[in-house]
Amino acid sequence: MAIKFRSSSDREMNRGSFADLRKLNNDELVILRANIETELNRRGISFKVGEVGEKLVISFFNSKPGLPNLLQAPVGAKNVDALSRDGERYSIKTFMKAKKTGTVYPDEKDRDKQLFEYLVVAKLDTNYRLFAIYRYPWGDFVRIRAWDRRMNAWYLPLSKKNLDMAELIFNKEPSHED
């Protein structure tokens, strides 16, 4: 996803002429991060891994012919982050280094009730760029999900075996056939 710059000074800032972060000591860097987080919050901009992943996945799907166009689900929709034009529900989970996804809370009355049509798992690199996108239909999620007793919810262990079971939508890694 490219950043559109409003002016040449914006481009210069992105190249590093605005501030060379390598010149800051650790304390200065932490203070800068705190100030940036404060300003993001003031503007209502979230920079949590999960929310960044949701936006990147929706944008990726919408930019690729052959993939459904997705719309962000209404705020507060339980376990659903995006909707296709055909009404299919997508739950999007994002990770960088984690060993499992975030939780999927079951229906209070029926623990096995279908909550979405697809679980999409997005892997981001440490620069918050898409590294891989995996898609699981509901039935596959049900077969490989695990129960978190503390959270009273489902999650997906991010083992190689489980990731290999998914439909690989995008992968930044070079294939072994290259």
Which functions belong to the PLM regions below?
Residues M1-D178:
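Nucleic-acid endonuclease domains
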